[in-house]
């Protein structure tokens, strides 16, 4: 099980949004065991929060650090931050404020992801949109009963239109006058939770990985 804290840093229009998502694989069904199939990952949203518009970045960072500290009590936690507009200073402030792992994501309009450093991803927005759309369509996401702002999240999701242009560019547009901060934070958490990891190595693959690590 892993925990991703998706953070969409607010600027002039939208407030900062924080979404804590837990990613796990359910137990295998007898049929999956028989055919050595891996159950798909599922996502459980535990916390949704908006930091009021106009809050200075120092206080935004403090709040993210508090939420990250609480999330670390659930399991291995990683802050996944949209660094497209805020730049490196916010990332550096967060690194000084929390012991939680951090990944900075810079959205691009390209087709291939690059990773200029261990904690920075330059990622096509289509990858994040597709990850969320796939999880939603497969109904592999749920909200814990006491998760705050889940109705606001559902409203944002219902007003968004996920589409792909003829040139392969992904877009997601909300209804006029609506915010997209919660959906953006959710996209970051789900995208990170869907990325390949050690739980994708099974049987001989896992044994081979373990031998290589010795």
List the predicted regions and their residue ranges:
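RNase H-like, metal-dependent nuclease domains and their acidic two-metal-ion catalytic environment used
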Residues: 1-107, 113-122, 126, 130, ...
């Amino acid at each position: 099980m892993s925990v991703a804290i998706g953070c969409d840093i607010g600027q002039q229009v939208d407030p900062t949004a924080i979404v804590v998502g837990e990613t796990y694989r359910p137990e295998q069904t007898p049929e999956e065991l028989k055919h050595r199939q891996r159950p798909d990952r599922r996502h459980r949203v535990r916390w949704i929060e908006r930091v009021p518009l106009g809050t200075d970045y120092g206080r935004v960072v403090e709040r993210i650090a508090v939420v990250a500290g609480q999330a670390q009590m659930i399991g291995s936690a990683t802050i996944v931050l949209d660094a497209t507009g805020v730049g490196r200073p916010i990332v550096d402030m967060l690194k000084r404020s929390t012991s939680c792992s951090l990944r900075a994501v810079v959205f691009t309009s390209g087709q291939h992801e690059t990773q200029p450093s261990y904690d920075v991803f330059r990622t096509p927005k289509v990858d994040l949109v597709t990850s969320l759309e796939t999880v939603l369509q497969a109904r592999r996401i749920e909200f814990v009963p006491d998760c705050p702002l889940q109705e606001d999240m559902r409203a944002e999701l219902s007003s968004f239109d996920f589409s792909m242009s003829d040139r392969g560019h992904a877009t997601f547009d909300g209804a006029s006058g609506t915010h997209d901060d919660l959906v953006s934070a959710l996209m970051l958490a789900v995208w990170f939770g869907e990325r390949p990891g050690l739980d994708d190595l099974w049987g001989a693959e896992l044994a081979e990985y373990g031998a290589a690590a010795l």
